[in-house]
Amino acid sequence: MDTSRLTLDHFLSRFQLLRPQITHETLNQRQAAVLIPVVRRPQPGLLLTQRAIHLRKHAGQVAFPGGAVDSTDASLIAAALREAQEEVAIPPQAVEVIGVLPPVDSVTGFQVTPVVGIIPPNLPWRASEDEVSAVFEMPLAQALQLGRYHPLDVYRRGNSHRVWLSWYEHYFVWGMTANILRELALQIGVKP
């Protein structure tokens, strides 16, 4: 599938037609969720954040809004929506949730469920200075081009795992964020 002319309608029909399949068993027990905010435009965008540099974990990394499930969250989707509101001021009622991707294990011990949602283009996104240093929009068609991701095999604690690397403008996109974007591309039928 060629992503260069990807429209929102095409993305939605492909995502809803090809249901995600869980391909591996997750190992982590602690639950987290992220929102993959697709901006409603004829040529859709993807909202990403850069985490604040002072954070203990993943400082300065490009990420989706999200975080750990807490006791007030009714579901993984509720957790993703709450975190998106806290981090970038996206009101939960403004998100049209279209589905979830299979959970992925993080190196920090979380099982992370990506929640895909459509958001209006005119939201006044605002970064929470406590957690986010920047909010930016990337064209979804570019984010879903598999050729932009480069593999790096990392050996950690006697185990090997593959990390994906990419760039957008001056942002370095890698790790779980790049992996989730690749999985989303594969989910809608982009061929490697």
Swiss-Prot record:
Pfam families (UniProt xref): NUDIX
Domain of life: Bacteria
Cofactors named for this entry: Mn(2+); Mg(2+)
Motif (Nudix box): 67-89
Residues reported in the UniProt entry to bind Mg(2+): 83, 87
InterPro entries given in the database record: CoAse (IPR045121), NUDIX_hydrolase-like_dom_sf (IPR015797), NUDIX_hydrolase_dom (IPR000086), NUDIX_hydrolase_NudL_CS (IPR000059), Nudix_NudL (IPR023735)
PROSITE patterns: NUDIX (PS51462), NUDIX_COA (PS01293)
Listed GO MF terms: coenzyme A diphosphatase activity; magnesium ion binding; manganese ion binding
Residue intervals of the Nudix hydrolase domain: 29-160
Keyword annotations from UniProtKB, A to Z: Hydrolase, Magnesium, Manganese, Metal-binding
Enzyme class: hydrolase
GO biological process, one term: nucleoside diphosphate metabolic process
Gene3D superfamilies named among the record's database cross-references: Nucleoside Triphosphate Pyrophosphohydrolase (3.90.79.10)
UniProt-listed Enzyme Commission number(s): 3.6.1.-
Signal peptide region: none
SUPFAM superfamilies: Nudix
Function (record text): Probably mediates the hydrolysis of some nucleoside diphosphate derivatives.
Family statement: Belongs to the Nudix hydrolase family. PCD1 subfamily.
PANTHER family according to UniProt: MITOCHONDRIAL COENZYME A DIPHOSPHATASE NUDT8, NUDIX HYDROLASE
Protein name listed in UniProt: Uncharacterized Nudix hydrolase NudL
Organism: Salmonella heidelberg (strain SL476)
